[in-house]
Amino acid sequence: MTDLHRLSIRELAEGLSQAKFSSRELTEHYLKRIAKIDPQVKSYVTVTPEQALREADAADAALKAGNATALTGIPLAHKDIFCTKGIKTTAGSKMLDNFISPYDATVVEKTKAAGLVTLGKVNMDEFAMGSTSESSYVGATSNPWALDHVPGGSSGGSAAAVAADLAPFATGTDTGGSIRQPASFCGLTGLKPTYGRVSRFGIIAYASSLDQAGPMARSAEDCAYLMNVIAGHDAKDSTSVKKEVDDYVANLNNTSVKGLRIGIPKQYFNVAGLDADVKARVEESLKKLEEMGAALVEIDLNMTEAYVPTYYLIAPAEASSNLSRYDGVRYGYRCENPADLMDLYKRSRSEGFGPEVQRRILIGTYALSAGYYDAYYVKAQKVRRLIQQDFLKAFENVDVIAAPAAPTTAYKIGASLDPVEMYLGDIYTIAVNLAGLPAINAPVGFDKDNLPVGLQLIGNYWSESQLLSIVHQYQQNTDWHTKRAAIAEENA
């Protein structure tokens, strides 16, 4: 079959279990596509064909023996922030160019245990700091919908790989929108779970109180399959929560859109910089949900103006602490011929970290410094609590909250956005991480340049099943999630 890459996860699972094709055939199909198409997209940092085919053969044996899981033999790609035993894990940084992890991240361990096949590691913004995937030391990834545009970030490689049909689904991480914004830019579905729902063990840390892993795929159904594998408590992660895990696939039709109350924050739709096409597509998608029986309720989120300053104090402060471990001594990049220990520290960090990472370390170090700690960091933590309370108050009246995932569609690679402009582009996504809430992006159409637009739905704590179910039903009544970029239509 030449069009295996067009099948959904459910169709792939059925095809494998009915022996219509083998995991080896499926894996070889994707490896061929990567070899042919990825030189244009540049989504993969490392492709692992030998390991992938070994895992595919093991999956075929398990399928024959009748001891397979629901997903045995299906390939996937991992964001290059997840530690993978024996495979390079760079986090998009020169600092970790030579780092081969001695262990697997829990998410990777779980995908292996489920019989999924690892195709390789995909590109990202350096240490997940960015919204374009341009800050990676290996260079920018292209958006499959327009190769001279960015795929978003930081999980841009994950989004581009799925959108170009170079992987059926992928793992991502989201610290301030890094799953939802690239999913929006690339026309995909991406879920950021509640903080503590998916283990962070083995994820290279950016901001530990904000980071969360999740699935990126074409549809809510595909995301649900991956969530069934990766969600759950992990004793190795102290922030992981002991809470029963839903069967996300079984629950896909369990939330009725009829009677659902969707909150429309008036502050969100009056943000300066909200593109007219984005606003129009999001409003059309809400009208569709209204036709399906949902009620649209205008709400106030009065803390909206505080999102960006609060996030860009807390996240860099945590980053400056987390990234202090990269000093050129134990692992990672080490400068040549240091004059003394201080020179080793200074030069290893100056040469190993890119400009955006250095910028955030400086902001964070400043915010945590003795004279400014109370004025900046402590104050930001207090405002963070107010942002959380703002959402909880809204959820007393509504079931979910709707917003664009990003104020614009994808920008051109190399567009000279200054850092503050880039930070303001995160306005719709960062509050979700500050509050620890779950949120999902769904593709809802295109702008005048045929670039994808995304609708974001924000849920109350632990409502991943509800969010996936709402988007699944929306996707049964629309076909935006089935649209493919021209490059994805190419055969290997």
Swiss-Prot record:
Keyword Transmembrane in record: no
Subunit structure: Heterotrimer of A, B and C subunits.
UniProt GO cellular component terms: glutamyl-tRNA(Gln) amidotransferase complex
EC number in record: 6.3.5.7
Protein's name in the database: Glutamyl-tRNA(Gln) amidotransferase subunit A
Classification via HAMAP family: GatA (MF_00120)
Catalysis performed (reactions): L-glutamyl-tRNA(Gln) + L-glutamine + ATP + H2O = L-glutaminyl-tRNA(Gln) + L-glutamate + ADP + phosphate + H(+)
EC top class named in words: ligase
Entry annotated with the keyword Cytoplasm: no
Keywords: ATP-binding, Ligase, Nucleotide-binding, Protein biosynthesis
A biological process term (GO) from this entry: translation
PROSITE patterns xrefs: AMIDASES
Molecular function GO labels: ATP binding; glutaminyl-tRNA synthase (glutamine-hydrolyzing) activity
Coiled coil: none
